[in-house]
Swiss-Prot record:
Segments of skewed composition (Low complexity): 10-20
Stretches the record annotates as Disordered: 1-24
UniProt xrefs under SUPFAM superfamilies: VC0467-like (SSF143456)
Organism of provenance: Rhodopseudomonas palustris (strain ATCC BAA-98 / CGA009)
This protein's GO CC annotations: cytosol
Protein name: UPF0301 protein RPA0913
UniProt xrefs under InterPro entries: AlgH-like (IPR003774)
Organism domain of life: Bacteria
Pfam families: DUF179
Gene3D superfamilies per record: VC0467-like (3.40.1740.10)
Family: Belongs to the UPF0301 (AlgH) family.
Lineage: Bacteria, Pseudomonadati, Pseudomonadota, Alphaproteobacteria, Hyphomicrobiales
Amino acid sequence: METASKRPKSGAAKKPAAAKARGDGPSYLDGQLLIAMPVMEDERFARSVIYICAHSSEGAMGIIVNRPAGSIDFPELLVQLDIVEKPEQIKLPDHAESMKVLRGGPVETGRGFVLHSSDFFIKDATLPIDDGICLTATVDILKAIAGGTGPKHAILALGYAGWAPGQLENEIQENGWLHCDADADLIFGDDIEEKYDRALHKLGIEPGMLSAEAGHA
């Protein structure tokens, strides 16, 4: 699996939540949210909330859901990807016009990844993850959204975050990340700037308290 060129660094802080177990095997985090600790040294992941799409003994892959990709919007991206030739050719439903383009991570930043609700599915292209959330990374879903036949809820990210085998587990043990159950309202919500605090609140943690405790084992 492709991984970021630099590993997220972390310091000592509160222990992460319990991971999901698969029978008697290892615990993996598919379908959960990673929440960066305040001591995260890698600016690419500072205050990031990452939805884990795949996690196994071979590594992990996730999408940052709270980092805008600059000022680019969905219609502009459709033109850049040559899905349409001119902006005036785009006729988007309201939910697509307001869809945020996010910076999903430092790997394959020129490629688009769409997290979306399970009411849309492309055979051999859509990956069901957990709790009605799926991942599709083909231009077909962008065309469907642009034409009003796409999923009800979606976010589009450029790039993804990747970890080598055992890397994510080590970072969690080093207290670089907290994790919690995901929910669609948080992932697909428009309040990008509030997602980090909302994720901490799911664990019953006040952001200010966490910052004060960071660095104290």
